[in-house]
Regions:
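Alpha-helical transmembrane segments
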Residues: 139-157, 184-189, 205-223
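Helix-loop-helix connectors at the membrane interface of multi-pass transporters/channels
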Residues: 54-78, 105-111, 136-164
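Hydrophobic alpha-helical segments and their helix-loop junctions in multi-pass secondary transporters
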Residues: 1-22, 209-219, 234-244
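Hydrophobic membrane-spanning alpha-helices of multi-pass integral membrane proteins
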Residues: 163-176, 197-206, 222-240, 257-264
Length: 282
């Protein structure tokens, strides 16, 4: 649809200053790092998806199936994110939508209707709505399982499962009421979600790194360790500066982020080696 409609897309070698948006100025003035990596919450890395392993992993017969189930699906989601990024770039370059972060939801509707027409636009919008609903459903199920197993809460009967679910649903309802009643509620909630989504990924990287130490794969531990350290820097720097966080000036926020990343690497390596040594003694 973007090619048929003739959406103007910019390449790396093009002039990044269009009539409607100066991309170069945005990258320098808006602190592209870490804001970009928080904004593209699921397209690059999604810690939120790791919460679904509690359910999905129980449906697999072997760990080899994890590559198709998790790794390949994240590559596919990255491809979807690239499509949306290109579509948004085309919409802004055409001047169909004002470049304003508060109008992001309206941009989605404009893209769907302009590229796919009224019927196709509705179908695409339904897809945009269904994806977070199904992800939320799976995440809440995983949360219930994790809480019940960690606190040793019996879940053998439907009544007991419903009781624990009701508590979780009540907490979610409070958050949704706030997002709906407050004028800036959704934007605030979305910022917290984006940050917490990337923060969750740190625990996934930590678990992978420790597992590799335990299973004599320490020479490959840099594969999860490097992105884990990077996103430690990103998430800590962002929350240190953000208004929803500690609102610290950028320079000390960057320093805090670097220190946190170094500490992350040190803790993971120390704990991983400790776990590996303990297993060797057994």
């Amino acid at each position: 649809g973007m090619f048929v409609k003739g959406y103007p897309l910019l390449n790396l070698w093009d002039n990044w200053q269009s009539a409607t948006f100066n991309y170069g100025e945005y990258f320098t003035a808006q602190h592209f790092i870490p804001v970009f990596f928080i904004t593209v919450a699921c397209g690059i890395l999604s810690g939120f998806h790791s919460t679904q392993t509690a359910i999905i992993s129980r449906t697999m017969k072997s760990e080899k199936q994890g590559r198709m189930t998790f790794y390949n699906m994240m590559i596919l989601e990255g491809f979807i994110a690239m499509i949306w990024a290109a579509a948004a770039m085309g919409v802004y370059n055409l001047g169909l939508q004002e470049v304003n972060a508060s109008l992001a939801t309206g941009t989605v509707g404009i893209i769907c209707r302009d590229l796919l027409g009224p019927v196709g636009g509705i179908i695409a919008l339904l897809g945009v709505i269904v994806l977070p609903i199904t992800s939320g459903d799976t995440a809440l199920r995983s949360l219930r399982l994790s809480v019940s197993e960690s606190l040793h809460i019996d879940q053998s009967s439907k009544a007991k499962r419903l009781g624990l679910s009701a508590i979780i649903f009540a907490l979610v309802a409070v958050i949704l009421v706030f997002a709906k009643s407050s004028p800036s509620g959704f934007n605030t909630l979305w910022r917290y979600f984006a940050w917490s989504n990337q923060t969750l990924s740190l625990f996934a990287f930590l678990g992978i790194s420790v597992w590799m130490f335990e299973n004599s794969k320490a020479k490959w531990v840099w594969i999860p360790l490097i992105p884990g350290a990077w996103y430690t820097f990103v998430t800590v720097t962002f929350i240190a500066n953000a208004q929803i966080g500690f609102h610290i000036p950028w320079t000390p926020a960057y320093i805090i982020g670097v220190c946190a990343a170094v500490a992350y690497v040190g803790i993971v390596v120390w704990y991983g080696k400790k776990r590996a040594a303990r297993l060797q003694k057994l």
